[in-house]
Amino acid sequence: STDVGAYHLVRILLENKRTTEAKLAARRAWVYIDMGYRIEKKFQKRYRKLLRKKDHIARLDRLLWKRRISASLRQLRRMTHDFQWLALARIALMRREPGVDYAVSKVPKHLIADPGLVYERVRWRRKKRLYDSAIKLLHQAPVPGAAAKKWWSERRILSRWLLRQDRADEAYRLSSTHRQTHGIGLAEGEWLS
């Protein structure tokens, strides 16, 4: 569905006193639908009482996984400082900005193992050719739930690098936890492991 359609669906549900359905529709739309600036502002203003903290967290996480940086930065206003630091660190890593170590150091301890942050740290290290450091971090990474294909991409690239370094055992350990269930990802994962 579209952002405008979701906005009007919630409005109609509320007008018809279907509050529970309106809450669910608003929360689902807020978390899963990309919204342009104007409709996002309108949606937030009109339906903010229907949204919970966890809806804002889930929206921010999804926007960051999709690399929707402008929308993520707008979302920061609705977040606690802890999640602001987390998002800013993820964005700094995505953009390969200077001072990423400082940005990561500002992330509170209880969020340092956030899968999105760990993923961006692995990716940043790989792109900076800090392969061994990226591999070490990847071995400590949480089981990929969200963005399994992105995680697999990093595992695949680093496994191939290990093979080129004649480190087949390490490549096997890294690729054997690919968690791909179909398609080319499964084929590559099984071949590498």
Task: Give the residues covered by each predicted segment.
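Alpha-helical solenoid repeat scaffolds
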Residues: 1-193
